[in-house]
């Protein structure tokens, strides 16, 4: 228990019960106050506004306000041909564009019922897992900054630059790649690409452990995240959570394993979930640990893809790409495991047009953010920063 003397309020006793609920005992009652956080705030990771109802330092309710970055993605897709939508998907989760491209390409390929060359599938998985690691490095580095630790950010972005260099070598772009096309790839990878990727895997494996320890062995970071923003597994499932958020609550659910696609059924990897030894299952620290552990699993996947890679002899990355895409009438839904959770595309075709009748994106960030009210209730105002950072939102995908 901590006792504070606050001017105008009197004696205040702050206690935490079961590493979860903050209990405030006051000698004098306080009035409820509405506190607006954002949309211009460094801790909201974009143009997010939170309207918080507070009782002193305790949050009783928090409501997110969205739409500041809305770009009419879904409506715009109805006015362009299927291949032209790929660059639009890059701008959803712009920190994991390869993963977004893969999910959209899978949906249209399912609608067209076309088979993809195996080499294309393996290359797709490699670039997607590289992008997953790069995305988690941003999440881990910026989370440290949110809570006052600047050094891990520098190390994370140092290693992220190597990954962006590899992806730029393959696609020609640092970000927003337009590389995974419907039915194939824009280009085959350079001849020494897999060698360079293998060297990165060898280099980064010990670095991943080092980056994890920089924060988890920091007493201040652990105090700010352990037992904060706990989400029970059943509530997380009811909200429709996915990705590291759901796994952070102890649910072993990963689309690459539970609803496998591409060549993931041929690959051996684990789905990390917290064991409750370092963190309280479902708290901010658990979600951070899941992202840190996932980077090592991505390295395992990349290594296996390189070992199983079919030869490039006679390979044409565009061999399965239709010259004109006009799917038969119907509708499909395809989903993929993105760094922030399940990204799904629902596409409807009228059978006549080269443009989709409807293209709906299912955003994991939007679903995860919708639980802010439950995550923040009973927490202190400074803990709200830790909670937002643990969600790892990208507003480009939330607003679309």
UniProtKB/Swiss-Prot annotation:
<keyword id="KW-1003">Cell membrane</keyword>
<protein>
    <recommendedName>
        <fullName>NADH-quinone oxidoreductase subunit D</fullName>
        <ecNumber>7.1.1.-</ecNumber>
    </recommendedName>
</protein>
<comment type="function">
    <text>NDH-1 shuttles electrons from NADH, via FMN and iron-sulfur (Fe-S) centers, to quinones in the respiratory chain. The immediate electron acceptor for the enzyme in this species is believed to be a menaquinone. Couples the redox reaction to proton translocation (for every two electrons transferred, four hydrogen ions are translocated across the cytoplasmic membrane), and thus conserves the redox energy in a proton gradient.</text>
</comment>
<keyword id="KW-1278">Translocase</keyword>
<dbReference type="InterPro" id="IPR001135">
    <property type="entry name" value="NADH_Q_OxRdtase_suD"/>
</dbReference>
<dbReference type="GO" id="GO:0051287">
    <property type="term" value="F:NAD binding"/>
</dbReference>
<dbReference type="GO" id="GO:0050136">
    <property type="term" value="F:NADH:ubiquinone reductase (non-electrogenic) activity"/>
</dbReference>
<comment type="subunit">
    <text>NDH-1 is composed of 14 different subunits. Subunits NuoB, C, D, E, F, and G constitute the peripheral sector of the complex.</text>
</comment>
<comment type="similarity">
    <text>Belongs to the complex I 49 kDa subunit family.</text>
</comment>
<keyword id="KW-0813">Transport</keyword>
<dbReference type="InterPro" id="IPR029014">
    <property type="entry name" value="NiFe-Hase_large"/>
</dbReference>
<dbReference type="GO" id="GO:0005886">
    <property type="term" value="C:plasma membrane"/>
</dbReference>
<dbReference type="InterPro" id="IPR022885">
    <property type="entry name" value="NDH1_su_D/H"/>
</dbReference>
<dbReference type="GO" id="GO:0048038">
    <property type="term" value="F:quinone binding"/>
</dbReference>
<keyword id="KW-0997">Cell inner membrane</keyword>
<dbReference type="Pfam" id="PF00346">
    <property type="entry name" value="Complex1_49kDa"/>
</dbReference>
<keyword id="KW-0874">Quinone</keyword>
<keyword id="KW-0520">NAD</keyword>
<keyword id="KW-0472">Membrane</keyword>
């Amino acid at each position: 228990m901590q006792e504070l003397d606050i001017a105008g309020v009197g004696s205040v006793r702050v206690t935490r019960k079961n590493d979860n609920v903050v209990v405030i005992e006051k000698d004098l009652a306080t009035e409820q106050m509405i506190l607006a956080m954002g949309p211009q705030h460094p801790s909201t990771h974009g143009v997010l506004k939170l309207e918080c109802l507070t009782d002193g330092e305790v949050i009783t309710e928090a409501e997110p306000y969205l739409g500041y970055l809305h770009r009419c993605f879904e409506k715009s897709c109805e006015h362009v041909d299927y291949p032209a939508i790929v660059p639009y998907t890059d701008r959803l989760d712009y920190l994991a564009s390869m993963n977004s491209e893969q999910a959209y390409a899978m949906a249209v390929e399912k609608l067209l019922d076309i088979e993809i060359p195996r080499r294309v599938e393996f290359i797709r998985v490699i670039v997607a897992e590289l992008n997953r690691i790069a995305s988690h490095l941003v999440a881990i580095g910026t989370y440290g900054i949110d809570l006052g630790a600047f050094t891990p950010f520098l190390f994370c972005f140092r290693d992220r630059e190597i990954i962006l260099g590899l992806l730029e070598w393959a696609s020609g772009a640092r970000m927003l790649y337009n590389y995974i096309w419907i039915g194939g790839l824009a280009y085959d990878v350079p001849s020494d690409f897999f060698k360079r990727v293998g060297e990165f895997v060898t280099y980064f494996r010990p670095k991943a452990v080092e980056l994890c320890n920089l924060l988890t062995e920091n007493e201040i970071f652990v105090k700010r995240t352990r037992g904060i923003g706990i989400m029970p597994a059943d509530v997380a499932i009811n909200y429709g959570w996915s990705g590291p958020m759901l796994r952070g609550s102890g649910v072993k659910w990963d689309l690459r394993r539970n609803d496998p696609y591409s060549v993931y059924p041929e690959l051996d990897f684990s789905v990390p979930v917290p064991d409750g030894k370092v963190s309280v299952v479902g708290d901010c620290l658990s979600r951070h640990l899941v992202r840190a552990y996932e980077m090592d699993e991505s390295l395992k996947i990349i290594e296996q893809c390189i070992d199983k890679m079919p030869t490039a002899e006679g390979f044409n990355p565009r061999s399965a790409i239709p010259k004109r895409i006009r799917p038969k009438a119907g509708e499909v839904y395809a989903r993929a495991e993105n760094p922030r959770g399940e990204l799904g595309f629902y596409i409807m075709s009228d059978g006549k047009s080269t443009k989709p009748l409807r293209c709906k994106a299912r955003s994991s960030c939007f679903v995860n953010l919708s639980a802010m009210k439950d995550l923040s209730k009973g927490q202190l105002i400074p803990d709200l920063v830790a909670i937002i950072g643990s969600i790892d939102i990208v507003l480009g995908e939330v607003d679309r």
